[in-house]
Amino acid sequence: MSITMRRTVLRSTVMAAATALAAAISTLPAQALDGQWCKDVHIRFFVGGAEGDAFGTIVYNGAKQAEADLGPKVDYIFSQWDVEKMVQQLREAVAVKPGGIAMMGHPGDASIMPLAEQAHKDGIRMMYQNVPVPKVTAAFGGGYVGAQQEVQGRALGAEAFKLAGLKAGDKAIMIGPFENESRGARERGTVAALKEAGVEVIQLSSPPSGEWASDPNLAIPVITAALLNNPDVKAVGYPGGQMLGNVPTYMQAAGRKAGDIFNFGFDTSPQIVEGFKGGWVQLTADQQPFLQGYLPILSLCQQVVLGLAPMNVDTGAGFVTPDNYEIVAELAKQALR
């Protein structure tokens, strides 16, 4: 076949494909192209924390915006970050047989697997946010919207080592749900990065019930004791925005002043912005929780109405520091970042 003929065939193939695509689009129901095109879809959405939770509120605001934009009927589920409660609520959600469920991945693959299997049998579309469940999605489908836990944790550890001016032999404290296979991967990654740089890391395990996230003041005695027993600690890492936003309280309870210790962690919030402003907080990793609310609902609507594949989006967005926090400050105060 000559080059000219090949070009002619290729051009004909492309034109045929374009014609077929246009024909396919023209057959979509009108509501798929208009506002509120997802109005006939019922979704159960897991917010994660309690109502008013610093992080969960941003997730919730993203989900509410998607609901307003697209029109589905959404039931919002609040779990106080309690993984056992999440599993029970997921069991109840599957029994209702909605069109789709957007589930927090905190309980992990093993706990979610049988319920994901039942959802698959019942034709319920699934999305997961904030914590990935790769074995579940490999077995029964579904997408994931959120940061990659270990990757983000390691990146934070490396950045903290650099910005805090740490060196081999220095001592740091890292708080986290280390025993949770899925959710704890992030903080384990931070610990690994610091240890590989030669830092001595004291690990403080947060309760599996998630109560420190629901009420950060409950951690005051543990953090205070750790700082008093280790007066040479140079840095402290926190597992989420709720605790990072409470840093002034922890430091003052231990008799420390702003800037005495390099405090770092994850997420943004109005409290964290104030922490930066007051010199209490030095570093946080942003994971754009608004997207973790908006995109799972968008993807479920696309799956149910348009037959599209589930979304997989890494929402890890880099770091916020004293040098750049003002860029996100106003949006953080509005619970949008």
Which positions does each model-derived feature cover?
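Basic/polar N-terminal segments that are highly enriched at the extreme N-terminus
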Residues: M1-M5, L28-D34
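Helix N-cap / beta->alpha transition motif
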Residues: M5-R6, T321
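Bacterial N-terminal signal peptides
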Residues: T13-S26
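N-terminal export leaders
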Residues: R6-V14
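A residue-level marker of the well-folded mature domains of exported/periplasmic proteins
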Residues: Q31-R337
